[in-house]
């Protein structure tokens, strides 16, 4: 989008108007793309990301993307984004991995049976401010990696196995909440906060 088009988009709305969750998610995705392209250093990206989720007006969000290429945000019709569909990740006598940049659906189920899996949310794009993960391991193992800023709620059960119930560190206010439920039977569900790796 050209600079003049960006100005027109900004002029079509009130800068002091309240931003929606959809607007905050859009800017978070733009920041993730900028970091992936090397336009933002890791510390700058994480700082802007936290500020994006805490922003309440269009003006605050526009400041975060003012020096980056990409579309300016505009008012939404209906106020809802199109979230990714519910997803099921299976590892039956095998494994699954979901890493890198991908859209996190609002609901996600992971299941390992005599297998293993890795679910890495650190570089993913959240499509909702609340994410529900159902994690099940039966004689298998899986690891869920969380970025430092997300809020986490865990309600898991274990029988002759492991299911992490706490993660080190606190999330940032306003950032998406990840709720993890499930159980392990002779298996393991590991849940960890892990810093993003600086771009080389």
UniProtKB/Swiss-Prot annotation:
Induction and repression of expression: Highly up-regulated during the early stages of invasion of the human blood-brain barrier.
GO cellular component: plasma membrane
Region (Disordered): 1-21
Pfam families: DUF1707 (PF08044)
Biased composition (Basic and acidic residues): 7-21
S-S pairs: none
Record protein name field: Uncharacterized protein Rv0966c
Organism name: Mycobacterium tuberculosis (strain ATCC 25618 / H37Rv)
């Amino acid at each position: 989008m050209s600079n003049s088009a960006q100005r027109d988009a900004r002029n079509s709305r009130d800068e002091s108007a309240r931003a929606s969750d959809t607007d905050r998610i859009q800017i978070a995705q733009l920041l993730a793309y900028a970091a992936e392209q090397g336009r933002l250093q890791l510390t700058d990206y994480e700082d802007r990301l936290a500020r994006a989720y805490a922003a309440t007006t269009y003006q605050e969000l526009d400041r975060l993307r003012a020096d980056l290429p990409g579309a300016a945000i505009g008012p939404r019709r209906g106020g809802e984004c199109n979230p990714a569909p519910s997803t099921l990740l299976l590892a039956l006598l095998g494994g699954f991995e979901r890493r890198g940049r991908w859209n996190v659906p609002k609901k996600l189920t992971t299941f390992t049976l005599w297998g293993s899996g890795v679910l890495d949310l650190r570089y993913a794009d959240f499509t909702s401010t609340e994410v529900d993960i159902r994690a099940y391991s039966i004689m298998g193992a899986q690891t869920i990696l969380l970025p430092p800023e997300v809020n986490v709620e865990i309600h898991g059960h274990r029988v002759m196995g492991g299911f992490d119930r706490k993660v080190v560190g606190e999330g940032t206010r306003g950032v998406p909440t990840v709720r993890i439920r499930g159980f392990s039977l002779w298996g393991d569900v590991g849940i960890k906060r892990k810093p993003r790796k600086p771009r080389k």
